Regions:
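Single-pass membrane-anchoring alpha-helices
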Residues: 12-15
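Conserved non-transmembrane functional hotspots
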Residues: 5-8, 18-141
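Membrane-interfacial hairpin junctions
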Residues: 1-3
């Protein structure tokens, strides 16, 4: 019976050391992913804003460098964006690709992307797509 007590005490000691270590490593990994997610969204929004400014000033938004920058920003979304952000982005792109589309509806879909990004980063938000409308670079220069 004494030998079992020693084994139990040893197991408790091992689990007492291993479990906090694993929890700490998991927390560190989640923080690293959250930081990479923020960087991915920041890169996407920066590229998006640069493109919006170019469009508003009738500047060229194509070419090798511009295409590469857009693709790299989208690659980061592919890696780190939530499913809701990717779905909102997909819906916006598909709607924008339609031959005839309403610009107000397109702005609404873009605001839904912004809302999904906020929800992903913050976990929740009390804002609506209407609250984000004035932050849309196509609504306000």
């Amino acid at each position: 019976m004494t030998e079992y007590k020693e084994i139990i005490v040893a197991l408790i000691a091992v689990f007492g050391a291993v479990i906090p270590y694993l929890l700490q490593k998991n927390k560190e990994l989640n923080l690293k992913i959250a930081e990479q997610k923020r960087e991915a969204y920041a890169s996407f929004l920066k590229n998006f804003t640069e493109t919006a400014v170019a469009v508003m000033h009738d500047e060229e938004v194509s070419g090798k460098d511009a295409d590469r920058d857009r693709m790299l920003a989208r690659d980061q979304l592919l890696l780190y964006a939530s499913d809701d952000v990717i779905k909102a982005y997909d819906e916006w792109v598909r709607y924008g690709d339609m031959e005839k589309h309403d610009l107000e509806k397109e702005d609404e879909l873009l605001n839904l992307i912004f809302l999904a990004i906020r929800k992903d980063l913050l976990g929740k938000t009390n804002l609506t797509k209407e609250h984000l409308s004035n932050l849309n670079p196509f609504n306000r220069g």
